[in-house]
């Protein structure tokens, strides 16, 4: 199944690596350090014990060709790797060598404290380089964001419906004639507005400038991080000074501070005033106040925290919503059945957390979309903090970067006819006695690692699932959907191990009279 995903280049890599007007100084530095680079890179990238699937040619000291091939054809490389070595192999990624493990190792990796997720994320996103400051929070033991994602955010669900209705009125309009829309752009707008309501409250949640910052910062983080990956680690802080993508990140953080810091200051002043008057200080149901409560008098950077939350919450959620919309367009009978489920469940209970849980067919359709197009081909990224051996004797040296393949989601022994979208698949599995709770969208298992697996499974998956379900309730009740005629359904795009819905895809929608009012 991995090889069935289409692989398309998303822009000219060399443009991303341009060093701007100061290129001459950067080149001089690189030439000066080249002899040292020769020694360090060759010894670091290719230790004698490594067998690398795409090692490249010996003369390519920075392995640029191998890295480019990984970014453009990772699915095929991974398939070749498992054909040669079904349990584990090494592959050269754009960020160095990676040990790829079979899904059978997922249970061992999921809870081993010698394997660090935090250090893996830090290695991907350069927290010590200007522009990437939000990622410093990942290594801060006081960071409360995981707790907020797991627990507090679910308190904000009641407000999401209002934001979806507002966003849809402009994104899809009230036009009762068929018209085309971009599912990717529509999903981004909806998720950005819903997340903003939960993260920063009502004052700025509809601010288009804030939406633009949190959407484009995530895109630019990936662009800048991947551009830096083409350089040896010891050169990246130097290269970043001249890299336009890194300069863009710094400008966006400054813009985020201009928007958010006055709001945070006003909140703090209001809280201090109430406390001085002896009045109770209420905590609003948004991340600004939850961060204030959790930090107390300890200093922290609220803007960095908001950008990190947005990075984690927006694009993955919007990608799943967009993919689900495109998949549903291939299954009009499924749309009809989900619409009937929404009408029945919400007609009785209204739009509540309990009602969202009862939308089991919708949940199944979403989980199936995620099965076919997860955010990554590989999951459970870790860095070994000490030398270790797995149960079968596989040795993992200290400092090894590893990930577990997600290809169990496309195994016919686990999911019959795995290439086919079947929105009823997980609904039927939940009818099996004893498996009612094992096949929910938020269930993270070794057979479905769409949200990861183990103690580091995505902490925001409950909030993400709720956002998407609220959005789909509005969309399916209020609009008819169909694919634009004249061709097959859009295919999933890939870059490296990352998967995402076709950003050029269009679907047709028209306003309909909803059976119940939300």
Swiss-Prot record:
CDD domains in UniProt: CYP503A1-like
Keywords, alphabetical: Heme, Iron, Membrane, Metal-binding, Monooxygenase, Oxidoreductase, Transmembrane, Transmembrane helix
Functional description taken from the UniProt entry: Cytochrome P450 monooxygenase; part of the gene cluster that mediates the biosynthesis of pyripyropene A, a specific human acyl-coenzyme A:cholesterol acyltransferase 2 inhibitor. The first step of the pathway is the synthesis of nicotinyl-CoA from nicotinic acid by the nicotinic acid-CoA ligase pyr1. Nicotinyl-CoA is then a substrate of polyketide synthase pyr2 to produce 4-hydroxy-6-(3-pyridinyl)-2H-pyran-2-one (HPPO) which is further prenylated by the polyprenyl transferase pyr6 to yield farnesyl-HPPO.
Main location: membrane
UniProt cross-references to Gene3D superfamilies, sorted A to Z: Cytochrome P450 (1.10.630.10)
Pathway(s) annotated for this protein in UniProt: Secondary metabolite biosynthesis; terpenoid biosynthesis
Gene Ontology cellular-component annotations: membrane
Organism of provenance: Aspergillus fumigatus (strain ATCC MYA-4609 / CBS 101355 / FGSC A1100 / Af293) (Neosartorya fumigata)
Biotechnology: Pyripyropene A and its derivatives have very unique characteristics of selectively inhibiting the acyl-coenzyme A:cholesterol acyltransferase 2 (ACAT2) isozyme. Therefore, pyripyropenes are expected to be developed as a new type of anti-atherosclerotic agent. Furthermore, pyripyropenes have been shown to exhibit anti-angiogenic activity against human umbilical vein endothelial cells. Finally, pyripyropene A also exhibits insecticidal properties.
A Pfam family: p450
Annotated TM spans: 26-46
Membrane topology annotation: Single-pass membrane protein
EC number: 1.-.-.-
Family under the similarity heading: Belongs to the cytochrome P450 family.
A biological-process GO annotation: secondary metabolic process
Cofactor(s) annotated in UniProt: heme
Lineage: Eukaryota, Fungi, Dikarya, Ascomycota, Pezizomycotina
SUPFAM superfamilies attached to this UniProt entry: Cytochrome P450
Localization annotation: Membrane
UniProt keyword Repeat present: no
InterPro entries assigned to the protein according to its UniProt record, in alphabetical order: Cyt_P450 (IPR001128), Cyt_P450_CS (IPR017972), Cyt_P450_E_grp-IV (IPR002403), Cyt_P450_sf (IPR036396)
GO molecular function: heme binding; iron ion binding; monooxygenase activity; oxidoreductase activity, acting on paired donors, with incorporation or reduction of molecular oxygen
Enzyme class: oxidoreductase
Binding site for heme: 458
The protein, known as: Cytochrome P450 monooxygenase pyr3
């Amino acid at each position: 199944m991995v090889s069935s995903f289409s692989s398309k280049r998303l822009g000219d890599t060399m443009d991303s690596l341009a060093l701007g007007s100061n290129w001459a100084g950067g080149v001089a530095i690189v030439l000066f350090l080249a002899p040292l680079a020769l020694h360090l890179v060759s010894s670091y990238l290719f230790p004698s014990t490594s067998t690398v699937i795409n090692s490249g040619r010996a003369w390519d000291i920075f392995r640029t060709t191998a890295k480019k091939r990984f970014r453009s054809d990772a699915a095929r490389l991974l398939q070749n790797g498992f054909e040669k070595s079904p349990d584990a192999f090494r592959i050269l990624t754009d960020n160095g060598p990676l040990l790829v493990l079979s899904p059978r190792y997922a249970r061992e990796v999921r809870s081993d404290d010698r394997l660090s997720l935090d250090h893996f994320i830090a290695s991907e996103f350069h927290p010590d380089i200007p522009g990437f400051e939000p990622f410093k929070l990942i290594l801060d033991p006081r960071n409360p964001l995981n707790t907020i994602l797991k627990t507090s955010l679910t308190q904000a669900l009641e407000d999401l419906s209002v934001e979806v209705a507002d966003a849809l009125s402009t994104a899809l309009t009230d036009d009762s004639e068929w018209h085309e829309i971009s599912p990717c752009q529509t999903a981004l707008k909806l998720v950005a507005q819903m997340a903003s309501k939960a993260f920063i409250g009502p004052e700025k949640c509809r601010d288009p400038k804030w939406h633009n910052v949190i959407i484009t910062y995530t895109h630019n983080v990936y662009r800048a991080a991947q551009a830096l990956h083409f350089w040896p680690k010891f050169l990246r802080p130097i290269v970043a000074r001249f890299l336009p993508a890194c300069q863009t990140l710094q400008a966006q953080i400054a813009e985020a501070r201009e928007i958010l810091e006055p709001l945070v200051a006003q909140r703090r002043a209001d809280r201090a005033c109430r406390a001085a008057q002896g009045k109770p200080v209420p905590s609003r149901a948004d991340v600004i106040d939850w961060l204030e409560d959790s930090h107390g008098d300890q200093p922290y950077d609220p803007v960095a925290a908001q950008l990190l939350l947005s990075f984690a919450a927006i694009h993955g959620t919007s990608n799943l919503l967009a993919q689900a919309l495109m998949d549903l367009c291939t299954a009009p009978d499924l749309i009809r059945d989900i619409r009937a489920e929404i009408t029945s469940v919400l007609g009785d209970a209204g739009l509540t957390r309990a009602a969202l849980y009862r939308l089991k067919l919708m949940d199944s359709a979403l989980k199936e979309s995620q099965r076919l197009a997860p955010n990554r081909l590989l999951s459970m990224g870790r860095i070994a903090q000490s030398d270790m051996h797995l149960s079968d004797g596989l040795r993992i040296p200290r400092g090894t970067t590893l990930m577990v393949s997600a290809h169990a989601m496309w195994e016919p022994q686990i999911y019959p006819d795995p290439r086919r979208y079947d929105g009823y698949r997980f609904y039927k599995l939940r009818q099996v006695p004893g498996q009612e709770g094992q096949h929910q969208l938020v269930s993270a298992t070794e057979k479905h690692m769409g949200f990861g697996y183990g103690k580091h499974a995505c902490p925001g998956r409950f909030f993400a699932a709720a956002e998407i379900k609220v959005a789909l309730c509005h969309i399916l009740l209020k609009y008819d959907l169909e694919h634009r005629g004249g061709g097959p359904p859009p295919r999933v795009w890939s870059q490296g191990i990352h998967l995402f819905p076709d950003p050029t895809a269009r679907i047709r929608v028209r306003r309909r009279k909803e059976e119940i009012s939300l």
